[in-house]
């Protein structure tokens, strides 16, 4: 009778693994230029909906969370503050920085949405949001230095997507924005962030 819980647990684990539907692959058919991505595609862990746009399977997603948690832990230890900025950003904040035309016409990097509510861009980066957020939050030089960071999806209109995940149109990125009193403080922030990733 005592063995039943163990048998039940083993059966549940087998069921979980079988439900992942991981495909069998022949390693001889792998593209040597992009072996990692090619293996993921053949396993079914990476699915291409269109050039530069991918969906990710269970193993990929779990691994991504593990890596994110390691990064978050190190950034938090370094005194950085986790935030979340909108992925849908109004044109007006990009007009304030005079970068709307740079990102939509000159470089043609940003995906845009124009409807009866107004004009918006899907975030290729978040300097505008970070600047406005910091200006509202940091009322005195005594609040400096401050480093805000987020981990989230970004969107860029890559014309020539290359090598699966090297230049996709959607991707997850950790971006950090620092507010410093002096250039020396800014350099110290850079060294701090460098050390975070060395850890």
Regions found by a protein language model. Name each.
Residues 15-199:
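TRNA-recognition modules of translation machinery and tRNA-sensing kinases, especially anticodon-binding
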């Amino acid at each position: 009778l005592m063995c039943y819980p163990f048998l039940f647990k083993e059966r549940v684990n087998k069921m979980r693994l079988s439900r992942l539907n991981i495909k069998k692959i022949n390693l001889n058919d792998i593209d040597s230029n992009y072996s990692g991505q090619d293996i993921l595609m053949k396993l079914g862990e990476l699915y291409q909906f269109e050039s530069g746009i991918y969906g990710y399977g269970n193993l990929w997603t779990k691994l991504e969370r593990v890596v994110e948690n390691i990064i978050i832990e190190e950034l938090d230890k370094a005194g950085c503050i986790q935030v979340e900025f909108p992925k849908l950003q109004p044109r007006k904040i990009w007009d304030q920085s005079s970068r709307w035309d740079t990102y939509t016409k000159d470089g043609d990097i940003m995906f845009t949405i124009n409807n009866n509510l107004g004009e918006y861009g899907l975030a290729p980066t978040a300097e505008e949001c970070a600047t406005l957020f910091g200006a509202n939050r940091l009322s005195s030089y005594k609040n400096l230095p401050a480093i805000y960071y987020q981990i989230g999806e970004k969107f860029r209109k890559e014309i020539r997507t290359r090598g699966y995940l090297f230049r996709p149109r959607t991707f997850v990125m950790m971006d950090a924005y620092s507010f410093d009193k002096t250039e020396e403080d800014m350099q110290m922030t850079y060294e701090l962030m460098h050390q975070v990733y060395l850890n």
